[in-house]
Amino acid sequence: MLRIEDALDLILAHTPDARNRSEAVTLADSLGRILLQDVFSDLDMPPFDRARMDGYAVRSADLTTATPDNPARLKEIGEVAAGKAFNGFIGVGEAVRIMTGAPVPAGADAVQKIEVINAKDGVVEIQEPTKPGQNITPRGVEAKAGKLMVEAGAVITPAAAAVLATFGCAMVDVGVRPSLVVLSTGTELVEVWEKPRPAQIRNSNTFSLAGYAQAAGAEVLSAGIVRDDFDETKRAIAETAAIADVVMLSGGVSMGDYDLVKPALQELGAEIFVEKVAMHPGKPTVFAKLGETLIFGLPGNPVSVAVAFHLFARPALLQMQGAKEIHLPRVQAYAASNVKGAPPRRSHQPGRLTIRAGRAEVEPLKWAGSSDVVAFMQADVLIVVPEDRKGYEAGELVDVILLR
């Protein structure tokens, strides 16, 4: 039985990276994809001294003695709006009406807000002094030309897309989405639209796994149920491995008479690297390769399949796309109540993270075991209990893996 770290190392060592797996897409189609190129600023940002608000562009030296009772009186010599430039120079005793986002005219070193200004018949009365640079965003303060803006390996979020657009990236190189098939094994499974008969349950793992895989960037080709039949299991694996980069199965990976995934893989000639992992839940996790196709055999219980996916399959899918960060973030929080461990296996228990009195606390969810999909829906973290601990008492600091 492998330690989690050893199992993950084996999986990633046999998972291809994004080399020779890139494609160019439009920026509009890039959201959620993994960027495979460093992007540098092609200009200063802003590319000019920019007004932060509506008002008047002025020389601060002209307003040093301005008060409501003795306002400075300046001559209005023009107007400049966003998207236009003022073709002139502001001299002593002059001002230009300016709008938010417009370039500050030459000669001006401040923008005075409209609220302290009276303007009439070409005369601008300003009731307060200004400081040099007031209400101006200087050229290049956000980014200098040539600066690295977005690194290769980053996820293109809406915020990153805005940066890419700012610096002219109409097309971007991204990692190819791995194609993936989900197979849920078990004669007890029925489709979601069917009413289960005695001893049957609806197939929920297909939908959670397909959703997790899509969230990790995979292109899910198909999903379905495979009965507990050796020939059917072998045929389903062979057929899907021929069309997909990844085949992900749930169930059929333990030691029972109807756990047929490993025997089917062996007869197909797959190379099995991981068979059991010292973790709870998720111990009977399998990883293999059939040709160049990755095969993940995950446990059948919904919570077990979710934990195993996030610890093993998600990092592999992200590595295939060239992601720099492939693991879920970890933080520490104080246990709000006692947390049980499962030595000699590492435990991952669903919990809820909250902030109380300025500190992070995590509450273990009350759940009925690894089949309790209803409780797991409420979880936003996994509470990690090491292999050598029986648990934690309330108030102790624990490690948690963020799921959201």
Q: What do the predicted segments below correspond to?
A:
Residues 1-8, 170-298, 302-308:
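Helix-rich terminal scaffold detector
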Residues 1-65, 70:
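Intrinsically disordered, low-complexity, positively charged segments
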Residues 2, 23-28, 37, 83, ...:
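Flexible glycine/proline-rich
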Residues 2-6, 22-29, 53, 71, ...:
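Conserved active-site and cofactor/substrate-binding residues in soluble primary-metabolism enzymes
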Residues 9-20, 36, 40, 141, ...:
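Generic secondary-structure signature for well-ordered alpha-helical cores
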Residues 35, 47-48, 76, 86, ...:
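Short, conserved secondary-structure segments in the cores of folded domains
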